[in-house]
Amino acid sequence: MSNWSIDDARASYNVNHWSQGLYGISDDGEVTVSPDPSRPECKIGLNEMAKDMVKSGVALPVLVRFPQILHHRVNSLCQAFNQAIQKYQYENDYLLVYPIKVNQQQTVVEEILASQVEKEVPQLGLEAGSKPELMAVLAMAQKASSVIICNGYKDKEYIRLALIGEKLGHKVYIVLEKISELKVVLEQAKELGVTPRLGLRVRLAFQGKGKWQASGGEKSKFGLSAAQVLQVITSLKQENMLDSLELLHFHLGSQIANIRDIRQGVSEAGRFYCELMKLGANVKCFDVGGGLAVDYDGTRSQSSHSMNYGLTEYANNIVSVLTDMCKEYEQPMPRIISESGRYLTAHHAVLLTDVIGTEAYKPEDIQPPAEDAPQLLHNMWQSWVEVSGKADQRALIEIFHDCQSDLTEVHSLFAVGQVGLAERAWAEQVNLRVCYELQGSMSAKYRFHRPIIDELNEKLADKFFVNFSLFQSLPDAWGIDQVFPVMPLSGLDKAPESRAVMLDITCDSDGTIDQYVDGQGIETTLPVPAWTQESPYLIGFFLVGAYQEILGDMHNLFGDTNSAVVRLDEDARTNVESVLAGDTVADVLRYVNLDAVSFMRTYEELVNKHIAEDERANILEELQLGLKGYTYLEDFS
């Protein structure tokens, strides 16, 4: 592909679409980031940045955060709603609430809060879904509007802490997930002398589509049915506390790809709001929950990895539906709240790491089978002769199916001793050579060739062994088949020489990325430029800022990676700050209740028993360094 261009690379990885202008490919084929979206002309090369970090002692893999992207996402979302409110003459305001479950890292939460620090009236609050999250939020919310929303199941301690938050000056909304929570809230509020701010999570009949659709619908784990909502109203009236019901909440699920689902959910919840107001409730806030999606594959579609709407359309739909409904039922317009954590955080973080080795199929010369070889082998040789153009052509699809069938039968005969090891090896080599020739002969412009091309790409793909743990750094890729954009960080000015799959360094066959963004679709392999030990390149995993860190596990005892915060200063200089060391071997041993100190004593006993005296000090030093070392491979330089 001598006419390969940078535009071809951008289209191949679809980077201009999934990145929303935050990441790109430079004219010299290097992946770049615009760390401050307000200055898109200021770009940083990720490849050189990673190499500089390594030189300064930060080993790969490293998770890099760009806090100015967080600021931009917060302000963009607030601006979209502010403009929609003005457009539809909505008679209230908008509040963005960050659910810290999406990414509880202190750096992330503080940077999100800092994005509104210069606003006269901050449009930002925090959400907690558990006691530990609430304890964090109580301390951090003072830097925002001091609005706190408490979701999740609650015991007496959780409820008391939330009420204490009210005494501390916060506006704490306790959202009732179960009807039994109401009694505890009222009892503890009376004991503490606090007037509670109550919210209701309603269980909608409508259920959105997607991987998290179980968050909504009549069988949802959370929320109150219509009958239970009426029970709450009755109980509050009896206690003369109906004015305490200030918030209505619903949640369709994370990553809602279709704007119609969002519109329909808001419409049904809006009817709940109007009915509650008719019953005398004092609902001031309408909380649409999460659902604002991230376009992971850049296709702007209804795929579970994508979204068929933009930020403006999202805000316009919510505001317009509520405007029309409140006017129709002559009800006041409530403050609109959204809990859009995935949208805020996904783009701000990228994992950078090295390839430690590759395994690729290289065509080898093959000889015809012996005359007395089984007929199956002669059949396979005939397929090779025909596909290589040395005999009359048959349909390429027929050759493929025949050769695959013959190889399957060879394997069966080997299992029962009718074919030897050398014959099996020969058959496998012929099959690979046939597949290799077919891959170059078939064309995607023929629809009936496409499924076989996909199968051949997967069968002949290079294996890239990458220095990371899928289970630690991209758990959703393993757990729910989530797609994350993956790109080589350099060499993209050259045409791809092969297709590859990315394998992690865990001892688990599931540690493989199975889906890749490729053009306007998803493929099982990734186009890559040539990689050699003499001319290696790094790999970037993008849009990993939401959920991945907190969901990551320590399979094979691979721990947290190193991380760093990178910021662009006023003079457009790159500042690497807040470098946080990843887990050491001793750290992860402690997590599973293994005592590194006692291990060291055991090593000393073994060294004294088995190692010559002049070697003991060096061996002990290596063992000690092993405990202090990074859990990932450290050979890259």
From Swiss-Prot:
- What is the E.C. number? 4.1.1.19
Describe the reaction catalysed, as an equation: L-arginine + H(+) = agmatine + CO2
Q: What class of enzyme is it?
A: lyase
Q: Which gene encodes it?
A: speA
Its required cofactor(s), as named, are:
Mg(2+); pyridoxal 5'-phosphate
Q: One GO molecular function term? A: metal ion binding
| Known function | Catalyzes the biosynthesis of agmatine from arginine.
Q: Which InterPro entries match?
A: Ala_racemase/Decarboxylase_C (IPR009006), Arg_decarb_HB (IPR040634), Arg_decarbox_C (IPR041128), Arg_decrbxlase (IPR002985), De-COase2_N (IPR022644), Orn/DAP/Arg_de-COase (IPR000183), PLP-binding_barrel (IPR029066)
Q: State which pathway it belongs to.
A: Amine and polyamine biosynthesis; agmatine biosynthesis; agmatine from L-arginine: step 1/1
Name by which UniProt lists this protein: Biosynthetic arginine decarboxylase
Record-level GO BP terms:
arginine catabolic process; putrescine biosynthetic process from arginine; spermidine biosynthetic process
Q: Which CDD domains match?
A: PLPDE_III_ADC (cd06830)
Q: What UniProt keywords apply to this chain's record, in alphabetical order?
A: Decarboxylase, Lyase, Magnesium, Metal-binding, Polyamine biosynthesis, Pyridoxal phosphate, Spermidine biosynthesis
Query: What organism, scientifically named, is this protein from?
Result: Shewanella halifaxensis (strain HAW-EB4)
Under the heading SUPFAM superfamilies, the entry gives: PLP-binding barrel (SSF51419)
Family, per entry: Belongs to the Orn/Lys/Arg decarboxylase class-II family. SpeA subfamily.
